[in-house]
């Protein structure tokens, strides 16, 4: 629970921490605060940005930090980690899934006639890793489905451990965390509970890791690094930038709530990949 191990800073995000603490300091998610402080763009209006204030606050995302470093998460990160550890003999007893990841990378390298370190850490490599990950997920789904069927056939129909589910058995103050390696990358939910009710809830989702604004000490997030030094052929049609960002498979808000300065809800815009967008007054 130490912020130097795992925390979020808001130095360049449109949020603020208590004045005595300062926005540059990282807070652990269990101590997280989500207090909006929208300062607007450097030039333009609050609704029509022309230039963001890169030296100040410029993003609605906080900056997650792992041991003081920004990180890229997702299929590319997983494949690079597993492949590197395998080649450095740090995985003496590889699982079948890890072996499959190594075999996938080497198969692509053979087709491209390029070493993994050449094609993998690129936009194309990031996109390819997502496709390879989908193939791996299919094999893993079949593996665990077979185990589920075997359990049911043996009479084991339990699907969850309910021993600690009853809130009346909890201490007056407690906390918990859910950690999961989602398809897009590292996902964590952090909750504080007092008297059986949630007192604070913080989420750090994969796109927050990748799309975060820079940290003055740790540097730029993955999106920003991917865009830097990228040549754009047509300035007002930056297709190269769009491709770079899309390679991360961004998870954008599917429901956006608009509030005025008094905290009154103005409207809700919900998007659906099949039905399009709907607006509620």
Question: Where do the model's predicted regions map?
Answer:
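Metal/cofactor-centered catalytic core regions of large enzymes
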Residues: 1-281
